[in-house]
Amino acid sequence: MRRRSSMDINRAIRVAVDTGNVVLGTKQAIKNIKHGEGQLVIVADNCAKDVKEDIFYYTKLSETPVYTHQATSIELGAICGKPFPVSALLVLEPGNSAILNVNNEE
């Protein structure tokens, strides 16, 4: 099985943001996860430890997969096409993206 490169993942994130339904930000992601919404959470590598623990706790309860991206929050924001840092994003609908195929679950 071929492991996806970071460029493939970055492109999949951007396509999901452009064509699908994605929630940006840790507070909104956690809120939606608590309501059982979302198909995949992507967390930046430098996300705050306490926030990351909350995300992992609620995703475990809701059985939502989590992918820890190797990019910083500033880089993840740029990947999403935003001029601000993004520590976490929740994919509600992937659109034309293959983002749900990432399998680096922690």
Curated annotation (Swiss-Prot):
SUPFAM superfamilies: L30e-like. The keyword Ribonucleoprotein applies. Keywords: Ribonucleoprotein, Ribosomal protein. Transmembrane segments: none annotated. One of its GO terms (cellular component) is cytosolic large ribosomal subunit. One of its GO terms (molecular function) is structural constituent of ribosome. GO terms for biological process: translation. The keyword Ribosomal protein applies. InterPro entries: Ribosomal_eL30, Ribosomal_eL30-like, Ribosomal_eL30-like_sf, Ribosomal_eL30_CS, Ribosomal_eL8/eL30/eS12/Gad45. Pfam families: Ribosomal_L7Ae (PF01248). NCBIfam families: PRK01018.1 (NF002172). Belongs to the eukaryotic ribosomal protein eL30 family. This is Large ribosomal subunit protein eL30.
